[in-house]
Amino acid sequence: EYSYIHEPVRKVDDWNHYPEAMDVRNFYGGDLQGVWDKLDYLQDLGVEVIYFNPLFVSPSNHKYDIQDYDYIDPHFGVIREDAGDVLAEGDLDNRHATRYQSRVTNWENLEASNEFFAQLVAEIHRRGMKVILDGVFNHCGSFNKWMDREQIYEGKDGYQPGAYVSADSPYHTFFDFRGAGPEQWPYNGNYDGWWGHDTLPKLDYEHSEALEKYILHIARKWVSEPYSVDGWRLDVAADLGHSNEYNHEFWKKFRKTVKEANPDALILAE
C-alpha cells in the first residue's frame, strides 16, 4: 500500500513466522470492529478498563509516530472512500501511494472513523467499562500533516503546507530546524528528532504557543463528548519539552485542561 522506513509495508499471513528485528512495517490485522465483536468476551473476563495503544492516523504498526491527532486511523475505523493505487513493486515513493493517501486524508473516511469510535466508547461505557487512550505528545511522526516529509498532504484541499515542504508553513515553529535559513527549503529534512530518529520529529513547544494550544485542544477533545474517553496514558512524558521547568509547567496545564473537561479522567504518565 505504501512504504515505511525505506521498505514496503505488508500484511503478515503466517503468524508462526518469527517477528523481524525491525517489525514496525508488518501488520497483523485487527480493527475497532474486532474490539466491538469481542466485548462480550472481555466483559465475561471481568475486564473493567480497555487501554488502547495509539489509535490516531499513523503509518507504523505501533503508531507512536502520529500522523494526525484529530482522527482515528481509518485502517482501524471506517474506510468509505478507497480510491487510488498501491505502490508498484520496487517503488518506495509515497507520493505515488495514492490509495494510502485517500484512506488517511479523505474527510469522509476520517469523520466516519471518529464517529465509529464514539459509538464504540458509548457501548463500552454501557457495559460498565472504561477507555484509556495513549497520548504521544513529545514527538509526532515524519508523516504528520504538520511536517509532511512524505508529501502526502502537499497540495490537497483542506491542508496547509507541512514544515518539511515550505519555510512558510504555519507549522514551522512546531519543530526545531536547527537555525536553518529559508534557502534550505523546500524539503528540508534537517530537524531535531527524538533520540535522533528522523521518523519521530520532536515537538518544539518552547518556541510555539500555537503548538501548545493545539495539543491542549487535543487533550480536551478526546475526553469530551462525543468521545468521552476516561483518561490518557502519556508516552515518554518526562521527555516533553527541552527543560524540566517547561515540562512541569506543560503537564500542569495539561492536567488542568483535561480535568476541566472531564473531572473523573485518569492521567497516567509513563
Place the predicted regions along the sequence by residue:
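Short glycine/threonine-rich loop-to-helix capping motif typified by GTGT followed
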Residues: 241-249
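Short His-Asn-centered micro-motif
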Residues: 53, 269-270
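Surface-exposed extracellular loop regions of Gram-negative outer-membrane beta-barrel proteins
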Residues: 224-241
